[in-house]
A protein has these predicted regions:
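Conserved acidic catalytic loop of the alpha/beta-hydrolase fold
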Residues: 1-12
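Catalytic histidine-centered segment of alpha/beta-hydrolase-like enzymes
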Residues: 129-141
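Catalytic histidine neighborhood in serine/cysteine hydrolases
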Residues: 115-132
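Short alpha-helix in the alpha/beta-hydrolase fold that links the catalytic acid
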Residues: 84, 93, 107-116
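Gly/Ala-rich beta-loop-alpha elbow adjacent to hydrolase catalytic centers
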Residues: 15-24
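Hydrolase active-site cap/lid region
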Residues: 30-77
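Short beta-strand/loop motif that positions the catalytic acidic residue
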Residues: 90-92, 97-99, 103
Length: 151
């Protein structure tokens, strides 16, 4: 995100999907000129992301702990500080949070948690679109456009 901003200039609207939503929320935690944020199918807790990765590739729980420690030590961070529902607690940028209740990749509860913690968020929950089809659904597209165009 920083690289894109350095190359093209600062954006004032950010739209992200899945893990990209989490990255945008973390970036916007420190950004001052952001006017609107849209997340679609966002994850929430980094621990869950790591758990799902470990499970999907068939690794052991011990590996998860090693990965977590590696990232925390290498980048001098607390991995929990990257949880989306944590980074939005002080967010004052109007945000639209979109998620499908039939998303099999990332549970809708992630976006519900983000919405509960975000003081300026609107939540849109859809049905029957899943994690990817939601991106091309006309109702979702119109909602996102309306949200961005609203003053």
């Amino acid at each position: 995100i920083k690289t894109l901003n350095n190359h093209y200039g600062e954006f004032d609207i950010y739209i992200g999907h899945s893990l990209g939503s989490m990255a945008i929320l973390k970036y916007c935690e420190q950004a001052s000129n952001v006017k609107k944020i849209v997340t679609i199918g966002s994850g929430d807790q980094m621990r869950t992301i790591f758990d799902n990765f470990i499970t999907s590739v068939g690794l052991k729980f011990k590996t998860l702990e090693r990965m977590k420690t590696y990232f925390q030590d290498k980048y001098n961070i607390n991995i929990n500080d990257y949880d989306a529902s944590y980074v939005v607690r002080q967010q004052q940028t109007p945000s639209l949070i979109v998620h499908d209740e039939d998303d099999l990749d990332i549970d809708v509860s992630c976006s519900v948690n983000i919405h509960k913690q975000h003081p300026k968020a609107t939540l849109m929950v859809t049905k029957g679109l899943g994690h990817r089809r939601i991106l091309r659904d006309e109702k979702v597209i119109h909602k996102v456009i309306s949200f961005i165009q609203a003053s």
